[in-house]
Amino acid sequence: MNTGDIMIIKKATAADLDRCLEIYKNAREYMRQNGNPDQWGTEYPYEHLIVEDIAIGRLYVVDCDGSIEGVFLMESGPDDTYLEIEGEWLNEEPYYVIHRIASSGKVKGVVNAAVDFALQNTKNVRIDTHEKNLTMQKVLEKIGFKHCGTIYVFAPWEGRSPRMAYHLAK
């Protein structure tokens, strides 16, 4: 598969759970191998969170020619995680947030597809990543996201953890 393949975004269903878990497992391993073992630890996102996200209708999959190759959480803000920032957002207009995005690694363009999907509903998208996730930082900056500062999340495996906060405004 290549970047020319058509990607379809759709809400995840219970039938997609095993594939989503597999993609997240592979993403954790990729991050670990690339110097970022802390962002998701060894088990995050937890299965019960994924099940809940599917039930709520905020987990999406990226389908490429009938195969799920990406997964992400998307919802409209405000997001409690983004209420306090060491820095400044580009604006305070309504936005969508993307969390827990992961790719199978078999296709390129999963992040682009998710962002394009979000931009169908808003002019502002916010996302964050770990300071050691150099791959994601490069992808976000290539798409046009601006690094706005630092936010903090609580991760059970590392406590209060800084994240690089990004904002795309169209």
Could you describe each region identified by the protein language model?
Residues L73-K106, W157-E158:
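Conserved acyl-donor/pantetheine-binding loop and adjacent beta-alpha core of acyl/acetyltransferases
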Residues V61, S67-G77:
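Conserved beta-strand in the GNAT
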Residues D128, K146-P162:
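Conserved catalytic-core motifs of GNAT/GCN5-like acyltransferases
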Residues M7, G66-V71, Y96:
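Glycine-rich phosphate/pyrophosphate-binding loop shared by adenosine-nucleotide-utilizing enzymes
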Residues S103-Q120, Q137-K142:
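Conserved acetyl-CoA-binding loop-helix of GNAT-fold acetyltransferases
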Residues R28-L49:
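Conserved GNAT-fold acetyl-CoA-binding loop/helix
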Residues Q120-K132:
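Conserved GNAT acetyl-CoA-binding A-motif
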Residues I8-E22:
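A short beta-loop-alpha structural element at the N-terminal edge
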